[in-house]
């Protein structure tokens, strides 16, 4: 739809723009098979774009008077909340005032605004909100009052006066009152409630004095030149009213909102959080007073107790009562959708179980303390909970459980296991041979690991073992005919699932013919048939859930070890316990030689109890001819008192120290301390700057080097890390920790821009508490912290409120628990206890920062020569060195620098007792490794990259520095990264979100003209679409199965699938054009982009033509139509 013509307003405030010269390389020659987009040279020369946050607000002023185009997602969500009366920018507020009184702002002030682009930007990025109960006519009355500036020379006094009035009126839930309290000169320092009772008359207000307990930085946000200008434009009455009654939000560079005045928006999320907020504002004294008052009134106590009992009962019923059919006309699907998460098969218990135990040794089926009848009743209660089932069906289910209890004791597990999942042939001799080879040398030991890792069990064999167990243990009439075949296929699918995939109720019951299950048969009148069918589906699902979630998973845990593999993403591999035991035996021998020491359980327990730590868990990940040890610290710390303390883990305990170290991490990047980068954004910032400098010196030849540290975390010297942290100039002696409320937009709730409806705020936002660490020597506002481009906070699409006084912590106090756990790290592995003697634990939340900081200190001394650069065209010298954890990349114009870099790092490793993977050394030139003392005399030919240089998933063109994303475009490689887990509630939105996530996941820098040309951007685009189409089809299959029996079935399913493709292609193009700075594509490329995108979906759906014939035909027809018809891209 085209944009409506903007309404003209008397106040003509333009949108601020900063002209930027576009620096683009010459377009490459056309590549066969790739789309040729429209040349936009003329448009490119005339177009002025904005930088940074200016660009994101490019459309803010386009609407003139109606203001609809100002609404970004957060702004629109606020406007759509029941608790919010109105939400408008300061710019729109000025326009509405002029309609009421054209003297506010005055003509003179209007001209000043028009000539002040910084103030214009401020107006567009300040949002004013009212509460639901606010009377909008109040502004009209105030606007017609006489314009006054009584506080022209005392603006701060006016701000203080408003705060005092709020305190007197007892409006303590306003952010303006944070840190302030009233003191009565006559009565001394009393509590606020007592003063209000004694001073109801306004004549006593002069007796009050405002005392500051701590600095209110929300107030500081108002003491700026821009707000002082707003005061001059509005006058006393309007400005004081806005500051007193409105909720004011400032938009940050990440499109988030910081609230600086008004009722804390966090109060509106729900009643519970409102009470928490009230307790925070009013303090413990009021609660004590209320308790005292209630104690003197027994009747009030009885009433409160009775009400509280009702609430407690309701909470218990909500937790226990999951599903109950009470009437024949109840919709099963509706009930099913309400309890989606309760109706998912849980698989977490399956993974990483290394214990060698017998089947059901501790299972209730083999309980020695309970009778068979008690076992049956307990299983039934566990499966069905409090749900009612008709007596006849309940008896049949009880009978099935009884037969399982008896038959599983007769089942020959060893026979069926060896029949379906045999060990390698001649395993006993192989085992001896492997142990002998592993003891000889490192190379042979690596071959042994590689061979053992290849003995993974075939998934179909495991599925056959499980289905034979069910066939022999359950009654013969449990599943028959086609239902039995469907069950076998479901079991195979269950075994093949990726790490985070599972069955939902809909996906599990799909294709089963429940009416053909003999033990679910019933006789009834036609009018009651629907009731019994719904009940049968529910019971059948509960029984299947018990089979998969309890029996099948327990069986697999007993006989197989389930794990991921390195570079296999989320694909799961199964090993017989006999094989995995040997892998663990060889692995722990290696770890004991490297960095572990076996200790007694008593020693570990004494340390953990005295220091309040929980021991970590160690597991292994297969990795080629070796293994990767993974430590996790998710165990709860024992003997902790309190609701939150009882759930405390080691990583939770280090959270405050983590905030301090994240501050250190930001400083390392900001001040270029060492050469560490921490994510792809850091990499691309430095890479883009380097590309610009390289082009300025006429693009000379570059020399590339990539190196990899061996066992990066294990080789960190803990004592030296402590020394570096204590002496570093990047760390302050003290740190402030901010506690903030964060409201995060729910991605699955979309606000209709054309016709939105008011909903409770909890429908649009979810909450969390976020801690932020800042230097103790500074005291910036929350807005200033978020505006810092080097901040390490993920605060996009959020509303943030600072909730309490900042707490100061000495550096040494924060570091103490980090140092203790690093120097005394205890882990458990295969029922044994170990202490880490070298390096830092890899699974701690702070480990990645400590590791990077350690190697950064070593780099600072050894690699200073790479900081010397020259932009002289005759003899240029520029260098780019980055290290992401343990992976180095050097790009330099001088070959000597590349050679010296390798030599320096090699010597650095020898002097600090760590190693590099010299076999993984990669360059784009030949070199003699013997010169720097390496044992290898020649370099491997495969390690020399001539055209594309590969580093951590990025391929760099050596001649042009264009980049391509490395994506595995084979079907197997694509699907191993997919987790379908279909959301049955809002399934259409789920499918749309899935396709968006396949395309728009951290890919913006591949489509920036400052880095890439269209030729290379199109290569990445092709890979993205190949992978996205493959994953989308897999999701559409689940989507179609779910809707086969719903109102969306038939042709409507195809239309929804196609509609989502169209919407997401348009959103993707909008993202690449509007959200990417200096984009490769222009708006006139839209039609060619759309046609090109469709081809990938047409190709993939053609392969599934039998299942998606309608989708393929419509997409093909759309493609032909677009070849003739012209479409335009317009932002709505």
Curated annotation (Swiss-Prot):
Similarity remark: Belongs to the reverse transcriptase family. Telomerase subfamily.
SMART domains hit by this protein: Telomerase_RBD
Enzyme class: transferase
Keyword entries, A-Z: Chromosome, DNA-binding, Magnesium, Metal-binding, Nucleotidyltransferase, Nucleus, RNA-directed DNA polymerase, Telomere, Transferase
Catalytic activity: DNA(n) + a 2'-deoxyribonucleoside 5'-triphosphate = DNA(n+1) + diphosphate
CDD domains: TERT
Subcellular location: Nucleus; Chromosome, Telomere
Species: Oxytricha trifallax
Main localization category: nucleus
Function, as annotated: Telomerase is a ribonucleoprotein enzyme essential for the replication of chromosome termini in most eukaryotes. It elongates telomeres. It is a reverse transcriptase that adds simple sequence repeats to chromosome ends by copying a template sequence within the RNA component of the enzyme.
Top-level lineage group: Eukaryota
Polar residues biased stretches: 9-26, 45-55
Binding locations of Mg(2+): 708, 886-887
Signal peptide start-end: none
Gene Ontology terms describing biological process: telomere maintenance via telomerase
Lineage: Eukaryota, Sar, Alveolata, Ciliophora, Intramacronucleata
Protein name: Telomerase reverse transcriptase
């Amino acid at each position: 739809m085209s944009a409506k013509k903007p309404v003209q307003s008397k106040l003509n405030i333009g949108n601020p723009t900063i002209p930027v010269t576009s620096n683009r390389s010459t377009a490459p020659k056309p590549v066969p098979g790739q789309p040729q987009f429209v040349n936009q040279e003329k448009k490119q020369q005339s177009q002025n774009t904005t930088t940074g946050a200016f660009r994101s607000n490019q459309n803010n002023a386009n609407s003139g008077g109606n203001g609809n185009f100002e609404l970004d997602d957060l702004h629109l969500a606020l406007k759509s909340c029941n608790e919010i009366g109105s939400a408008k920018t300061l710019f729109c507020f000025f326009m509405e005032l002029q309609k009421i009184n054209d003297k506010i702002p005055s003509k003179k002030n209007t001209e000043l605004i028009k000539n002040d682009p910084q103030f214009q930007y401020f107006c567009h990025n300040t949002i004013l909100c009212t509460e639901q109960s606010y009377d909008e006519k109040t502004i009209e009355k105030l606007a017609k009052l006489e314009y006054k500036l009584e506080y022209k020379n005392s603006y701060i006094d006016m701000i203080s006066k408003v705060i005092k009035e709020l305190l007197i009126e007892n409006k303590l839930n306003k952010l303006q009152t944070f840190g302030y309290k009233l003191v009565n000169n006559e009565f001394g320092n009393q509590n606020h409630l007592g003063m209000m009772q004694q001073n109801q008359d306004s004549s006593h207000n002069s007796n009050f004095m405002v005392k500051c307990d701590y600095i209110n930085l929300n107030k500081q946000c108002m003491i700026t030149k821009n707000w002082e200008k707003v005061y001059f434009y509005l006058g006393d009455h309007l400005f004081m009213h806005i500051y007193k009654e409105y909720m004011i939000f400032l938009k940050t560079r990440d499109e988030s909102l910081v609230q600086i005045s008004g009722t804390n928006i966090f109060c509106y999320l729900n009643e519970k959080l409102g009470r928490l907020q009230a307790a925070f504002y009013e303090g413990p004294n009021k609660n004590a007073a209320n308790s005292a008052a209630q104690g003197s009134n027994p009747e009030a106590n009885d009433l409160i107790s009775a009400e509280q009992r009702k609430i407690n009962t309701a909470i218990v019923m909500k937790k226990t009562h999951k599903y109950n059919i009470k009437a024949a006309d109840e919709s099963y699907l509706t009930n099913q959708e309400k309890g989606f998460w309760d109706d998912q098969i849980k698989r977490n218990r399956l993974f990483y179980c290394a214990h060698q135990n017998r089947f059901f040794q501790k299972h209730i089926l083999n309980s020695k303390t309970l009778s068979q009848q008690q076992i049956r009743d307990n299983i039934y209660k566990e499966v069905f909970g409090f749900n009612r089932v008709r007596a006849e069906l309940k008896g049949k289910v009880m009978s099935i459980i009884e037969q399982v209890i008896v038959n599983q004791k007769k089942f020959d597990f060893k026979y069926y296991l060896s029949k379906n999942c045999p060990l390698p042939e001649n395993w006993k001799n192989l085992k001896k041979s492997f142990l002998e080879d592993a003891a000889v040398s490192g190379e042979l030991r690596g071959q042994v690991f590689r061979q053992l890792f290849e003995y993974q069990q075939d998934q179909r064999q495991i599925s056959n073992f499980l289905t034979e167990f069910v066939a022999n243990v359950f009654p013969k009439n449990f599943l028959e005919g086609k239902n039995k075949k469907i069950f076998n296929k479901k079991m195979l699918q269950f075994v093949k699932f990726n790490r985070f995939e599972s069955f939902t109720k809909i996906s599990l019951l799909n294709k089963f013919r429940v009416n053909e299950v003999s033990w679910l048969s019933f006789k009834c009148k036609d009018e009651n048939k629907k009731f019994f069918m719904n009940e049968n589906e529910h019971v059948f699902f509960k029984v299947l859930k018990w089979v998969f979630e309890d029996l099948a998973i327990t069986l697999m845990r007993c006989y197989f070890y389930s794990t991921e593999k390195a570079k296999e993403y989320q694909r799961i591999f199964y090993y017989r316990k006999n094989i995995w035991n040997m892998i663990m035996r060889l692995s722990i021998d290696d770890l004991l030689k490297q960095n572990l020491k076996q200790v007694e359980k008593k020693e570990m327990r004494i340390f953990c109890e005295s220091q309040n730590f929980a021991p970590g868990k160690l597991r292994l990940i297969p990795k080629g001819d070796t293994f990767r040890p993974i430590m996790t610290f998710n165990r709860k710390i024992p003997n902790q008192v309190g609701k939150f303390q009882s759930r405390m883990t080691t990583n939770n305990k280090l959270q405050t120290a983590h905030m301090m170290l994240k501050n250190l991490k930001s400083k390392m990047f900001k001040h270029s301390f060492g050469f560490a980068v921490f994510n792809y954004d850091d990499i691309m910032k430095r890479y883009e700057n380097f590309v610009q400098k390289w082009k300025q010196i006429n693009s000379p030849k570059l020399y590339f080097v990539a190196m990899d540290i061996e066992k990066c975390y294990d080789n960190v010297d803990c004592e030296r890390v402590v020394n570096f942290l204590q002496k570093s100039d990047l760390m302050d002696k003290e740190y402030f920790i901010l506690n903030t409320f964060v409201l995060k937009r729910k991605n699955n709730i979309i606000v209709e821009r054309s016709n939105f409806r008011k909903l409770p705020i909890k429908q649009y936002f979810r909450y969390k508490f976020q801690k932020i660490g800042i230097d103790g020597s500074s005291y910036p506002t929350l807005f200033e912290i978020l505006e810092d481009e080097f901040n390490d906070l993920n605060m996009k699409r959020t509303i943030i409120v600072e909730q309490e006084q900042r707490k100061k912590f000495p550096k040494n106090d924060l570091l103490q628990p980090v140092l203790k756990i690093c120097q005394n790290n205890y882990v458990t592995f295969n029922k044994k206890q170990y202490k880490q003697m070298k390096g830092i634990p890899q699974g701690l939340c702070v480990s990645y920062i400590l590791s990077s900081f350690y190697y950064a200190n070593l780099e600072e001394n050894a690699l200073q020569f790479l900081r010397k650069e020259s932009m002289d065209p005759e003899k240029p010298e520029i260098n780019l060195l980055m290290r992401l954890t343990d992976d180095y990349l050097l790009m330099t114009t001088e070959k000597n620098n590349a050679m010296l870099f390798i030599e320096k790092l090699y010597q650095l490793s020898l002097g600090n007792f760590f190693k590099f993977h010299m076999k993984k050394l990669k360059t784009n030139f030949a070199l003699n490794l013997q010169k720097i003392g390496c044992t290898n005399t020649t370099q491997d030919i495969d390690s020399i990259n001539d055209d594309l240089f590969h580093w951590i998933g990025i391929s760099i063109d050596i001649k042009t520095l264009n980049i391509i994303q490395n994506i595995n475009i084979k079907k197997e490689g694509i699907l191993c990264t997919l987790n379908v887990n279909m959301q049955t509630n809002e399934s259409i939105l789920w499918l749309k979100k899935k396709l968006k996530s396949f395309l728009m996941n951290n890919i913006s820098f591949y489509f920036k003209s400052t880095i890439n040309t269209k030729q290379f951007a199109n290569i990445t685009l092709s890979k993205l679409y190949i992978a996205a189409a493959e994953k989308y089809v897999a999701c559409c299959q689940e989507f179609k199965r779910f809707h086969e029996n719903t109102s969306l079935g038939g042709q409507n399913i195809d239309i929804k699938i196609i509609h989502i493709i169209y919407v997401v292609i348009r959103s993707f193009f909008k993202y690449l054009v509007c959200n990417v700075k200096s984009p490769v594509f222009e708006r006139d490329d839209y039609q060619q982009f759309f046609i090109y995108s469709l081809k990938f979906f047409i190709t993939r759906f053609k392969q599934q033509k039998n299942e998606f014939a309608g989708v393929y035909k419509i997409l093909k027809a759309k493609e032909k139509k677009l070849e003739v018809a012209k479409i335009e891209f317009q932002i709505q």
